[in-house]
Amino acid sequence: VKSCFERYGYAPIETPAMENIETLTGKYGEEGDRLIFKILNSGDFLSKSKIDKKTTSKSLSVDIANKALRYDLTVPFARFVVNNQNDITFPFKRYQMQNVWRADRPQKGRFREFYQCDADVIGSKSLFNEIELIQLCDDIFSDLNIPNVEILINNRKILSAMIEMMSSTNIFNDFVIILDKLEKIGIENVKNELVKIGVQKDKLNILDSFLNIRDVNDLKALLNDSEIGNKGVAELDFIIKKIDKLSLKNSEVKFDISLARGLNYYTGSIFEVKSSDINIGSIAGGGRYDDLTSIFGLNDVSGVGISFGIDRIFLVMDELNLFPKNIDVSSQVLFLNFGEEEASYCLALLKQLRENNINSELYPTDDKIKKQMNYANKKRVQFVVMIGEDEIKSGELTIKDM
């Protein structure tokens, strides 16, 4: 993954595991905010808080926690860009490979701590960036030999037009969060939740009409004269037509009108990546954010990025038996230890092997040979080298192919 990022011209950065809590909250929606791991302040801050029966955990957390573990890599990246804007060459292409934390219930494909690999371009509104990220995604999964990858694509501007036709109130963020749960809770429950946030029942047929759309061009008739909706269609159409001419290796790009991505900061193209062979949810996802840096004081800086969930990708590779058989082999060669003189003789040979990029090690103590050989077997070492008194005298080695 790292080599593919660098092949596309992305440079690495890292950000702290902890962020000020106000940096993170309000960027992921109400549900996302609940999953942020808060860090208790040092000292007895609780004694200074006014606690009574009306005190809620939310109001109390303001007094006792002003730091949190990062929820994703995108929001800290936006802060990084603002803090370093005078030293950055725009458009700025960065990749970042670090852990993130979610206060979630652990289950298959869901983790409280997991590894994300992000690639973003910021400081450019060009849709060619979206096209490049789709190519990057295809190359990464091709390099990993993961077949039958689906890249689902939609545009937040189209979703904005949908909710404008269904409701006169500004409930877009709530609408996106509800629509994002369609696959999990089903269409009827989605409709029930939309009614709860103010959508009239006689407007729900508009949702049905949109969800029946399979082709981008068919959207135009439904959107009528919606300026923002038609702009979203034009952006989608541009990306899909360019991608169709590129002949992707392992991936297929599909338009999915129900794709919403529940994070508040997306404003344009959104995409989600799944394995057609393994039902584990998304293994990558991302989108366009036009004003994320503005919350930190830097306006009119658009960005787009994609995030790869490495832990889920590992699960897919494991289910499909894609890991090489020697993936957990740390040493190719093990020198057995017959005593101080023999071990000292091995050191120069070890140095030569390592200088030639051959992973090798010396067993540290002169334990029984059976114990040393068991060590080699458990570590799946390919070759064992035995140098005793006779081998030192003759200048020859005894090598066992394991």
Residue ranges of predicted features:
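A short beta-strand-loop structural module common to alpha/beta enzyme folds
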Residues: A11-A17
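Short, conserved phosphate-binding/catalytic loop or strand-edge motifs used
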Residues: F111-C117, I153-A161
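Hydrophobic mid-domain F-helix/FG-region of cytochrome P450s
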Residues: L136-D143, K157-M166
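Positively charged, Gly/Ser-enriched RNA/tRNA-binding surfaces
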Residues: V1-Y8, E19-E22, T55-I64, D72-I88, ...
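Polyanion/phosphate-binding surface patch
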Residues: M18-K67
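Acidic, His- and aromatic-enriched active-site or binding-groove loops in soluble protein domains
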Residues: G32-K48, S168-V190, S275-S276
